[in-house]
Amino acid sequence: MDPNLKQRIIDEAYVLFLTKGMKQTSFCDVAAAVHKSKGAVMHYFSSKRHLIDTVVKMRFFPASQLSPEMDYLEGRRWDEFLRSYKNPIERVIDSFPEKLEGNGLMYYMQFVSSANEYMDEFPQMYHELLTREQDFLFNAVVVIYKQSVDDIQVLSLIHISE
């Protein structure tokens, strides 16, 4: 038995869901992509919904998350922050396999639309992702604003003392 088969199924299903859409992707398509039988795929995933749920939770949402480095950059200079920050869509597209380069936004939109259709909890999960992102950005702006105010106060003190 292939010890990495479950992960390979998830990875190949993700690519197929991105390129073909969830509705148009069958277990046979996934099986062909991993060079196994449909039964081998069904050994790990009893239904298409189970496979979709796993792909969304193990590939899509982890790729959407902020990297730990962004916490460090939150208190840095604004230009440094802006150079490093990527929104959730950019982060997911950057995680796509090389063979999907060039049409990332189209694949992203197709995936989100399909996931919304297949997973009842997807809208809530997506909303939570965007809420966390909004909170992070708000906090980053507050920190940078406070730094700017402090810088202005220091500069005005320097100017007054001259």
Residue spans for each PLM region:
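Hydrophobic/aromatic residues within well-ordered alpha-helical segments
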Residues: K48, V55, R59, A63, ...
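Conserved small/polar residues in nucleotide/adenosyl-binding loops
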Residues: I158-E162
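Solvent-exposed, amphipathic alpha-helical segments
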Residues: R8, E12-T19, Q65-L66, Y108-F111, ...
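Amphipathic alpha-helical packing segments from all-alpha helical-bundle domains
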Residues: Y107, N116-K146
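Helix-turn-helix
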Residues: R8, L16-M58
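Hydrophobic alpha-helical connector segments
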Residues: T54, P68-G104, L155-S156
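Short, charged helix-capping/linker segments at alpha-helix termini
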Residues: K23-Q24, Q147-D151
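N-terminal intrinsically disordered/low-complexity leader segments
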Residues: M1-P3
